[in-house]
């Protein structure tokens, strides 16, 4: 259920702060958001897949923590990221 390499590379290129940046909070949140959106389609077809749902909740929690970190560090970057990803917060 993971993203393919081309999709990941495109997301990293779009949200990276500098060349080769894969660890900034923006990139991590964007990758988690893409994975979460990908898994939502899986759960529409497989409602009883509770094992994968636990992984989804873990990803959502990790994204929430990264967003909270970014909000405390730099509010402008946080608001820009929320707007670019279309998250409701």
UniProtKB/Swiss-Prot annotation:
<comment type="subunit">
    <text>Part of the 30S ribosomal subunit. Forms a bridge to the 50S subunit in the 70S ribosome, contacting the 23S rRNA.</text>
</comment>
<comment type="function">
    <text>Forms an intersubunit bridge (bridge B4) with the 23S rRNA of the 50S subunit in the ribosome.</text>
</comment>
<dbReference type="InterPro" id="IPR005290">
    <property type="entry name" value="Ribosomal_uS15_bac-type"/>
</dbReference>
<dbReference type="Pfam" id="PF00312">
    <property type="entry name" value="Ribosomal_S15"/>
</dbReference>
<keyword id="KW-0689">Ribosomal protein</keyword>
<keyword id="KW-0687">Ribonucleoprotein</keyword>
<comment type="function">
    <text>One of the primary rRNA binding proteins, it binds directly to 16S rRNA where it helps nucleate assembly of the platform of the 30S subunit by binding and bridging several RNA helices of the 16S rRNA.</text>
</comment>
<dbReference type="GO" id="GO:0022627">
    <property type="term" value="C:cytosolic small ribosomal subunit"/>
</dbReference>
<dbReference type="GO" id="GO:0006412">
    <property type="term" value="P:translation"/>
</dbReference>
<comment type="similarity">
    <text>Belongs to the universal ribosomal protein uS15 family.</text>
</comment>
<dbReference type="GO" id="GO:0019843">
    <property type="term" value="F:rRNA binding"/>
</dbReference>
<keyword id="KW-0699">rRNA-binding</keyword>
<keyword id="KW-0694">RNA-binding</keyword>
<dbReference type="InterPro" id="IPR009068">
    <property type="entry name" value="uS15_NS1_RNA-bd_sf"/>
</dbReference>
<dbReference type="InterPro" id="IPR000589">
    <property type="entry name" value="Ribosomal_uS15"/>
</dbReference>
<protein>
    <recommendedName>
        <fullName>Small ribosomal subunit protein uS15</fullName>
    </recommendedName>
</protein>
<dbReference type="GO" id="GO:0003735">
    <property type="term" value="F:structural constituent of ribosome"/>
</dbReference>
């Amino acid at each position: 259920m993971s993203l393919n390499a081309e999709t990941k590379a495109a997301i990293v290129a779009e949200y990276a702060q500098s060349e080769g940046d894969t660890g900034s909070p923006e990139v991590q949140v964007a990758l988690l958001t893409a994975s979460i959106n990908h898994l939502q389609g899986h759960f529409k077809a497989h409602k009883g897949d509770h094992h994968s749902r636990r992984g989804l909740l873990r990803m959502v929690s990790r994204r929430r923590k990264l967003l909270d970190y970014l909000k405390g560090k730099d509010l402008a970057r946080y608001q820009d990221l929320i707007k670019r990803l279309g998250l409701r917060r």
